[in-house]
Amino acid sequence: MNHLIIFAHPNSVRSFGRAIANRIEQISQENGVNVFFRDLYEMNFNPILSHEELQNANNGIIPEDIQQEHDFILQADLITLVYPLWWMGFPAILKGYLDRVLSHGFAYKTENGESVGLLKNKQMQQFITIGSNVDKYKEFGVDKSLNHCLINGLFNYCGIENVEFELFGDIHLIDDKARKAMIELAAQKTQAKLTALLKEKE
């Protein structure tokens, strides 16, 4: 079984998000799962979708670096995104990754005038760090907006259903004990996903 972890944070070594991603990688390896770890900043991923690339994608011509990401996604049974929420959206490098990688003909197609998602039979989870208070976000409905637009809205469009996500808030205010509890929650949720997927493959 294959697990694709996509991590986006400029502090690739010491960020809280990296600690979450590392723990998820560890729990996956402990389950005998093959892990593809994509650290977008460490890769120096180019997030700019050029006009030429957009036109080529519509004609089925894909750059080599994007084809590699396509291969990782196609092989993945579980896809995990770990990133900070900045200005109510993805970090620019992750947004650019999705712009370039979720291309027409790969992530979706047009059939009888309608878009059809092509990334079926895949599980996804997202762990999102925020500097603000999660309860305040929920009070204003931000969590629902994120779910409708960036999470299930975006990935349902590509054929991935029931995307689960967890917001980890107040990350600059909480102590190490609280951070460790959040990391272990991410590990527990990942373990539950892996257990269910491994059982399906028996």
From Swiss-Prot:
It holds the Pfam family Flavodoxin_2. Keywords: Oxidoreductase. InterPro entries: Flavodoxin_fold, Flavoprotein-like_sf, NAD(P)H_dehydrogenase_qn. It comes from the Bacteria. The keyword Lipid biosynthesis does not apply. Its EC number is 1.6.99.-. One of its GO terms (cellular component) is cytosol. This is Uncharacterized NAD(P)H oxidoreductase HI_1544.
